[in-house]
Amino acid sequence: MASDLVVQFGNILEQPTIFPTEKGKVNVVVTNQGDTQLNGPVNLKLYASTDKELDNNNLNTLGPERGANDPLKGTDELLGNLQNQNINLAPGQSQTITVDFAGSEFRTPSVVSPGAYYLFAEVEPGSNITENKANNVANQLITQGDVVIQWNAILLNAIQTSGKGDASGTPPPIGARNQAIVHAAIYDAVNAFDGSHKPYLVDIDPPAGASVQAAAVGAAYQTLKSLYPTQTATFDEQRDRSLNEIIDAPVAEKAGFDFGVKVADQILAARTNDGSAQAQRGYTPGTDPGDFQPIPPGSQPLLPQWGLVTPFAIRSVADFRPEGPPEFSSPLYGREIETVRQLGAKNDTAVTKITRTPDQTEIAQFWANDRDDTFRPPGQLNEVAQEVALAKGTTLAENARLFALVNIAEADAGIVAWDTKYTYDQLRPITAIQNADNDNNPQTKGDPQWDSLLATPNFPDYISGHSVFAGAAAQVLANFFGDNTSFDIPSQELPGVARSYSSFSQLAQEDADSRIYGGVHVPLATVDGVLVGQNVGGFVFDNVLKPI
């Protein structure tokens, strides 16, 4: 046969970081597996993915703006291309290429979660070389942090995978619920070993000598397998990998893992009849001016009964429900709609001239995560928690509590948000703006050709889900680490773009503002959304998982 290049990963010399740090160094080994000499240029491409399947469709490329104006349409990311590397290999010979992410050819990943993701290497010979395309791609799992952070990443990857292709995906409130279930189980399993804090639900003693790390793995594995049964093979593989990396004795690992499974089963049982299975029941649109109308007309809006789901920590949804939006015919609402018309338009029209700045456009895209094949808004905030926890060097027990608090707060914030949405049933800006000539509000200007920069979600405007989730997560993170914490984070929506923050409250505000710039929420829906989220997050932090 002819020459045949095979690629595989060698040593990970320095663990790659998440953009924008741009640190990491890996070896890629290219081998001539054919029976003839290979002499010529090759290209080496590196990609990042949340799973073991490289999706070459709609890949983001680096570009002169490093992705700033090129939102990701697929799920995987091209990290760079080392071009025209001269290879001279006899049959059976290998050559090692060292990829340095601090160099100019490659950037560190943006679209993955730092706890667990895959690097892909692909070797492409020049046009004068025949190549077997079946074996010129290799992957390598990259992990960071302890088992809590790693399994948080596995959880986010599962949420993204659930929305790939024609799959239905995990809507934000459901994602927040699932995240809370997983991390409540991990927390109760880990906390049982030292009992330093109150349990969330399960108060049982672990077996003597059991491995606490294996207990965390067992809790994560069991909950994820129940929540995403079609991905069990992935969870099986990660379970085996996690247990192999634990240095405790096999008997201790088994005892710990089984204990974690036992804890998880009790958490899952407690959520069996929480109302989530009935949340998509029917919805009848209102007929009054200002009532939400499904988008597109006649469709079923998302989760109209989610406000009836049993909360994880708060006592009553009504305790956190805001007073509501201004009257549809009021001058205040008219001014709000005019703000969105000018800031949130997709294109200029005969009526509307966009006033949004390039930075505001980037903010809208950066925080979107509306596509089914992303981590979704609650998951994006979990990635923020991962980044900060890794930077702070928090312990296993601290991470178990941190992620439980963040996700319990997000889950309850989502329930309050959806209760509020369908209580007040406020129409979306796109409907109001396109029909404003008939709304009897002198403050508004109708524009039938107007469209929002971001796709408008199919559920009511007030209050903003993004804002509520951001407020809740930011409040927990601020209480845990201190609000004035500086950090940089990337986005799945804009590979190669990172934004910098000097506080968690700044992050929450920008996430909320993004929905105005995206044209999908009026300002008050975001202002009240952040406040509701902060109230829920503060309550959760002050009332559950407290020190003993």
PLM region descriptions:
Residues 1-144:
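Extracellular/luminal regions of secreted and cell-surface proteins that mediate adhesion/ECM remodeling
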